[in-house]
Amino acid sequence: MKAAISLIIFFAILFVVIEAISYEEGKELFQKERAECVGDGQRCADWAGPYCCSGYYCSCRSMPYCRCRSDSGK
């Protein structure tokens, strides 16, 4: 019985450690992506980057000249 409880506790701790590591990696990737964004009127490509910063969307009125536009003007 003690072995089963110990095994359950071991796997619970292992799960928590794995989740903490994957959360930190995801957070780091998100911050890196936000640092490489472009602003209003700059060239963008939603499918491959560079991506528009928060508050902007990629508008492709004439391919391949896509530009970041403000979300407020939609």
Swiss-Prot record:
Modified residues (Serine amide): 72
Cystine pairings recorded for this chain: 37-53, 44-58, 52-68, 60-66
Domain notes from UniProt: The presence of a 'disulfide through disulfide knot' structurally defines this protein as a knottin.
Alphabetical list of SUPFAM superfamilies matching this protein: omega toxin-like
Function statement: Insecticidal neurotoxin that induces an irreversible spastic paralysis when injected into insects. Modifies presynaptic voltage-gated sodium channels (Nav), causing them to open at the normal resting potential of the nerve. This leads to spontaneous release of neurotransmitter and repetitive action potentials in motor neurons.
Cellular localization per UniProt: Secreted
Stretches assigned to coiled coil: none
Signal sequence bounds: 1-20
Molecular function (Gene Ontology), one example: sodium channel regulator activity
Assigned GO CC terms: extracellular region; host cell presynaptic membrane
Recorded family membership: Belongs to the neurotoxin 07 (Beta/delta-agtx) family. 02 (aga-3) subfamily.
Chain residues in the propeptide: 21-34
Domain of life of the source: Eukaryota
Statement: the UniProt record of this protein carries the keyword Signal: yes
Tissue: Expressed by the venom gland.
Stated name of the protein: U3-agatoxin-Ao1b
Keywords: Amidation, Disulfide bond, Ion channel impairing toxin, Knottin, Neurotoxin, Presynaptic neurotoxin, Secreted, Signal, Toxin, Voltage-gated sodium channel impairing toxin
